[in-house]
Amino acid sequence: MNPLLNTLQPYPFAKLRKLLEGAKLPEDLKPISLSIGEPKHPAPDTVKQALFDHQALFEKYPPTGGYPELKEAIGNWIEKRYGVKLDPASQILPTNGSREALFALTQVLIDPTQDPVVVMPNPFYQIYEGAAKLAGAQPYFCPMTAETGFKPNYSSIPEDVLKRTQLLFVCSPNNPTGTVLSLEDWRK
């Protein structure tokens, strides 16, 4: 067993679900749950029908790199939305969600033989820390406080940490604060 597993924190959503277990909601109010970012609405009927119509695709494993048609559709959407042309064959890799992609990316990029650091905002999306630790890197937390406008202050990172940094996580809008970095923030 990988001994680095012992360094991981409990996943916060499991903890949150346990805290919310048995909570009584006021009967006269219809609260909106902002606790866990999971779908709150059923899939549209058109999506359900498309899945039904193409259920034969689910009878075998998909291609490792994703279906070419899906990758091309993603590339077309990115080009239309952002004006960026990507090569679907070499620059687009569908995943089952952001956690899978962020974890895999971290494992690929980190060289644990070089005393690596992964810089991440704090508060942060839990997978950043777990992926860094399991890749053999030391997490370095950039605090986001009222004083920094709830934005990470990367200029406060010590030089020795920067020299060892192999990966920097940036999320805008930030999860969980919702803070959006301006173009000027990105330039810093």
Description of each model-found segment:
Residues 1-3:
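Extreme N-terminal starter segment of soluble prokaryotic enzymes
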Residues 6-97:
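N-terminal small-domain helix-loop-helix segment of the aminotransferase-like
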Residues 58-188:
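Conserved core of the PLP fold type I
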